[in-house]
């Protein structure tokens, strides 16, 4: 009975093994072989007496060689649809070349030989045209603005004014340059955010009032008499009891002139002389027109304030610094003048200070020469020297500065006329 069962089981087992694939059978054989090798190695080590470590190492080498030979065998059957064979380097290189060729071919569009190629029409970007148009408009506006600035300067003929001042005002080159810089910047356009307030300060006889008269004459010639006001305190408001009347007159003249100038798009010029004797109430009226919280037409005006205030400070500064040939009037001088002006009234806080310094003797000679030519007299050099020697001078560092400036030149020349 038992023999029959074993006989029946043996064919069944044999049939199951036959169903397994060839790799399974190879693994079974390799496992059996490993077991027999282990047993034989152990028996050999026991008989020969070699150490177990060397036996184990040799056994590992044998197993690795058996595994390598197992994978190298051709017992694996090549499947029809899929396998796990690792590709060689040659196959990989060949496949990459084929793929590259396919990609290169796919990029080109093939057209039939008898068909005309119709390439897509390239559409031009409109943004580029808009950008060019915008740049052209901006350039035109800039060019137009520059032309308008030139037109304004030509309208007031500031170049001619500068030449006149340089020709007829002696010894005040720095003051004239500063004055013209302010006028050119302000009169270049008609719209401003504040009025231009200039203050001529210096000792007597240095050319402040003479410069004011030249400015009034020039602007009357280029604009009209209706847009230029010359106001002398000693002449227009000599009596302190008439201050209220003077206030009304000054306020009315300024308002009326500004209104007319705004209609014709012109900038009026107001010249106030002898401010050192002007009443405080009248200074308050002027200060009201210098404020920023006014209508726009009152912001387009030029105010020139002429006074001897700060003249002593300028005289001391020039005499103390006579050895220095400074190109520009230092800020220290303007600070000294402004300190003296603030003691008089606070309206000078918004003014641009233009200091007029002392005149040297050579400038006095120029004044005599110019006056002689005006009167039609022969300009004898020795006669001019004698006339200039009659004036008083400050002497400092081999330089002579006139105490009274050119103020007595006209009177001295008039004394010559009966004898010529």
Curated annotation (Swiss-Prot):
Its main location: membrane. The keyword Nucleotide-binding applies. It is a single-pass membrane protein. GO terms for molecular function: ATP binding; ATP hydrolysis activity. GO terms for cellular component: cytoplasm; endomembrane system; intracellular membrane-bounded organelle; membrane. It comes from the Eukaryota. Keywords: ATP-binding, Membrane, Nucleotide-binding, Transmembrane, Transmembrane helix. Pfam families: TOR1A_C (PF21376), Torsin (PF06309). The chain crosses the membrane at residues 130-150. ATP binds at residues 202-209. Disulfide bonds: none annotated. InterPro entries: ClpA/B (IPR001270), P-loop_NTPase (IPR027417), TOR1A_C (IPR049337), Torsin (IPR010448). It is found in: Membrane. Belongs to the ClpA/ClpB family. Torsin subfamily. This is Torsin-4A. It comes from Xenopus tropicalis (Western clawed frog). The lineage of its organism: Eukaryota, Metazoa, Chordata, Craniata, Vertebrata. The gene is tor4a.
């Amino acid at each position: 009975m038992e023999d029959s069962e074993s006989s029946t089981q043996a064919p069944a087992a044999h049939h199951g093994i036959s169903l397994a694939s060839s790799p399974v059978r190879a693994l079974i054989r390799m496992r059996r072989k490993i077991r027999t090798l282990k047993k034989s190695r152990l028996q050999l080590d026991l008989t020969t007496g070699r150490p177990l470590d060397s036996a184990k190492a040799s056994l590992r080498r044998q197993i690795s060689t058996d595994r390598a030979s197992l994978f190298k065998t051709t017992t694996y059957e090549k499947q029809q649809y899929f396998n796990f064979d690792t590709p060689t380097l040659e196959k990989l290189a060949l496949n990459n070349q084929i793929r590259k060729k396919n990609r290169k071919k796919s990029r080109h569009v093939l057209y039939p030989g008898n068909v005309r190629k119709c390439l897509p029409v390239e559409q031009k970007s409109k943004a580029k045209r808009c950008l060019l148009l915008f740049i052209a408009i901006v350039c035109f506006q800039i060019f137009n603005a520059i032309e308008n600035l030139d037109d304004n300067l030509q309208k007031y003929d500031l170049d001619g004014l500068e030449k006149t001042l340089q020709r007829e005002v002696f010894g005040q080159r720095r003051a004239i340059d500063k004055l013209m810089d302010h006028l050119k910047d302000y009169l270049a356009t008609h719209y401003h955010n504040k009025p231009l307030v200039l203050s001529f300060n210096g000792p007597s006889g240095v050319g402040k009032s003479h410069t004011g008269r030249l400015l009034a004459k020039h602007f009357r010639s280029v604009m009209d008499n209706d847009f230029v006001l010359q106001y002398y305190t000693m002449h227009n408001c000599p009596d302190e009891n008439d201050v209220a009347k003077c206030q009304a007159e000054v306020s009315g003249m300024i308002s009326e002139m500004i209104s007319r100038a705004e209609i014709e798009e012109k900038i009026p010029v107001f010249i106030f002389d002898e401010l050192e004797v002007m009443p405080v109430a009248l200074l308050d009226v002027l200060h009201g027109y210098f404020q920023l919280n006014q209508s726009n037409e009152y912001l387009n005006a030029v105010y020139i304030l002429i006074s001897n205030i700060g003249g002593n400070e300028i005289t001391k500064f020039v005499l103390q610094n006579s050895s220095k040939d400074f190109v520009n009037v230092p800020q220290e001088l303007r600070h000294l003048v402004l300190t003296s002006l603030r003691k008089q009234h606070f309206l000078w806080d918004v003014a641009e200070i233009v200091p007029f310094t002392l005149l040297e003797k050579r400038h006095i000679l120029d004044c005599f020469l110019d006056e002689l030519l005006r009167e039609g007299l022969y300009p004898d050099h020795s006669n001019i020297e004698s006339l200039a020697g009659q004036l008083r001078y400050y002497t400092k560092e081999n330089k002579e500065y006139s105490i009274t400036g050119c103020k007595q030149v006209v009177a001295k020349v008039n004394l010559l006329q009966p004898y010529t």
